[in-house]
Amino acid sequence: MQVFADIAVLREQIKQIKREGRRVAFVPTMGNLHEGHLTLVRKARELADVVVVSIFVNPMQFDRAEDLKNYPRTLEEDLSKLNGEGVDLVLTPTPETMYPQGLDKQTFVEVPGLSYMLEGASRPGHFRGVATIVTKLFNIVQPDVACFGEKDFQQLAVIRQMVEDLCMDIEIVGVATVRELDGLAMSSRNNLLTLDERQRAPVLARTMRWISSAIRGGRDDYPSIIEDAVDQLRAADLEPDEIFIRDARTLLPISSESKQAVILMSAFLGKVRLIDNQVLDLQTDTKASSEEE
């Protein structure tokens, strides 16, 4: 496994790989790797001859300085895990390398609409930061395919739209969320939970499954379902942040045309913000009754 901090040196390596006609898969990460990240790496290995991973805590996508400061950084452990998975190339740039003129003078990429709805409405600039860094990394790595986790559902939608809009010749593959045995979605932020918070954290996933069961059972009173879910979270001392039930393709409100719904949830446990989502098929009769209202 080769590790690069220098973009130009990595580019030369990628050029040689391309000249040899080998297919490149890319997994961008912010480090503090867990089984969810490694699942992305394994999927990438299935799809290409060469696997490239980046480790970069992107300051442009953080809306709170405290979150950026506290984000876990475990580079040596991360490199050991990637080496164990047979990763070929790893890019570990610094903020100064990625943003040599500083964030204020950085050209940015922004996906209209998707970037400022749902989570984007409460985190202005977040998805701009995501789209910008992913575009920069795509330009550096020049992958044929890139793998992203479905846990960050809106982020995946933003990236797919960006790739389509900018005519990037890159296949975007979404990989299912990996969960702990108690159902909690794996996340680097889970390491910041206290023991007591960690024991309560699975309530988020349980509440999400309850919402799914309610919809599958025929309920289409979505505002009322969300109110009930908020009560369930607060009963376990989780502070609800956002709960949405939307069309899984457009992220717009459910309509008679919707074939699938996505439940998007976030809640705070102490200072840690947890997120989760679930996609489910919609029954024809449920959609019809919802539209009639």
Curated annotation (Swiss-Prot):
Look up the domain of life of the source. Bacteria
Listed under GO biological process in this entry are: pantothenate biosynthetic process
Record's Gene Ontology CC terms?
Answer: cytosol
* Chief localisation class: cytoplasm
Q: Which residues bind beta-alanine?
A: 61
Catalyzed reactions: (R)-pantoate + beta-alanine + ATP = (R)-pantothenate + AMP + diphosphate + H(+)
Query: What's the Enzyme Commission number for this chain?
Result: 6.3.2.1
Residues at which (R)-pantoate binds: 61, 155
What pathway is this protein a component of?
Cofactor biosynthesis; (R)-pantothenate biosynthesis; (R)-pantothenate from (R)-pantoate and beta-alanine: step 1/1
The protein's location, in the record's own words, is: Cytoplasm
InterPro entries xref list: Cyt_trans-like (IPR004821), Pantoate_ligase (IPR003721), Pantoate_ligase_C (IPR042176), Rossmann-like_a/b/a_fold (IPR014729)
Q: Which CDD domains match?
A: PanC (cd00560)
Enumerate the GO terms in the molecular function aspect: ATP binding; pantoate-beta-alanine ligase activity
Q: Family membership, please give it.
A: Belongs to the pantothenate synthetase family.
How does this chain assemble? Homodimer.
Role according to the record: Catalyzes the condensation of pantoate with beta-alanine in an ATP-dependent reaction via a pantoyl-adenylate intermediate.
Q: What else is known?
A: The reaction proceeds by a bi uni uni bi ping pong mechanism.
Stored PANTHER family: CYTIDYLATE KINASE/PANTOATE-BETA-ALANINE LIGASE, PANTOATE--BETA-ALANINE LIGASE
In Swiss-Prot or TrEMBL terms, this protein is called Pantothenate synthetase
